[in-house]
């Protein structure tokens, strides 16, 4: 009896072990996405293997940080090395501002060569909230604006940032419609932008950040700093080459049913929204305003901001026009 049990157990172990095999190495060779400090937008044509990377007009083309998203296990290498290439920084200061890169699959059997071109661009002057950046594995919306260049004008490109990456840490939603910043189809014309204040759940309570307000801004969101210093996690600004006169648009607004502060309900108080644009001076490219000083910094030279009286609750699309007022001399 005992012998039969032992034999059965041995045969079962052998059967299980025979099913365990090494997983096949990935055979994909492609570039799925590209980001970087100056990158506003990356247009990838998978058929022609051509990538246009739009950066702001004042970017240093001899030192472009490019972070490529590749299939699992794949590697990438510039076909010709430049003396200025250091780690993920590449030199695109040649006349065509383009170079070729080859991706090799994890199994080493497949390669794909891409022509990558860096295109200097300016900020758009109108924003429509019509387009979302396709991003594999990202469930929240990332807005961008794109106006192709002509023979006489450079391209106009901007990628919007938001606090959505920080809200993802809460685990409160796995659907794009549950995020504080999202696209909606019933905008003033076509699509629009919806900003909502959301509960951060038990995760937010643990770090004493009980709510997350929807926001949208030009700049970047520093996810690594989101928990320890959330105000400084929002980095505002991009180089701009004109003198703005006014900020115009349309809004609707509905205040939340309750107003909370540090997790406690505050009676007889209502939340409000803010719309503003600032123009500020920076002595070096690395200098950026953040959430702690975006309205108070001495570097601000002009500001357009909606007044508290004008930021009213309304179910109808309401026009606003905010003139830029000079600041700090």
Q: What are these model-predicted stretches?
A:
Residues 284-329:
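Extracellular carbohydrate recognition and processing domains
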Residues 50-51, 231-235, 305-308:
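Short structured motifs
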């Amino acid at each position: 009896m005992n012998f039969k049990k032992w034999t059965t157990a041995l045969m079962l172990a052998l059967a299980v072990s025979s099913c365990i095999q090494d997983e096949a190495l990935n055979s994909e060779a492609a570039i799925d996405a590209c980001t970087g400090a100056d990158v506003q937008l990356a247009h990838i044509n998978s058929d022609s293997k051509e990538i246009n990377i739009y950066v702001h007009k004042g970017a240093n083309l001899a030192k472009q940080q490019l972070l490529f998203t590749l299939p699992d296990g794949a590697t990438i290498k510039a076909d010709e090395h430049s003396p200025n290439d250091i780690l993920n920084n590449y030199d695109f200061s040649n006349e065509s501002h383009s170079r070729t890169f080859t991706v090799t699959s994890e199994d080493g059997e497949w390669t794909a060569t891409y022509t990558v071109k860096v295109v200097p661009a300016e900020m758009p002057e109108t924003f429509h909230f019509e387009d979302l950046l396709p991003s594999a594995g990202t469930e929240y919306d990332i807005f961008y604006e794109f106006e192709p260049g002509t023979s006489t004008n450079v391209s106009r490109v901007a990628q919007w940032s938001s606090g959505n990456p920080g809200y993802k840490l809460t685990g409160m939603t796995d659907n794009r419609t549950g995020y504080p910043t999202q696209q909606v189809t019933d905008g003033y014309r076509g699509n629009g932008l919806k900003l909502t204040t959301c509960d951060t759940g038990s995760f937010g309570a643990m770090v004493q950040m009980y709510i997350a307000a929807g926001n949208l801004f030009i700049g970047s969101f520093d996810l690594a700093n989101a928990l320890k210093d959330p105000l400084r996690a929002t980095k505002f600004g991009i180089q701009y080459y004109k003198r703005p006169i006014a900020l115009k648009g349309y809004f609707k607004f509905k205040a939340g049913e309750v107003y909370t502060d540090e997790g406690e309900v505050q009676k007889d108080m209502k939340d409000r929204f803010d719309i503003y644009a600032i123009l500020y001076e920076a002595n070096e490219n690395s200098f950026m305003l953040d959430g702690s000083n975006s309205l108070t910094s001495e570097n601000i030279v002009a500001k357009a901001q909606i007044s508290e009286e004008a930021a009213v609750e309304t179910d109808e699309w309401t026009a606003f026009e905010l003139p830029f007022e000079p600041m700090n001399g």
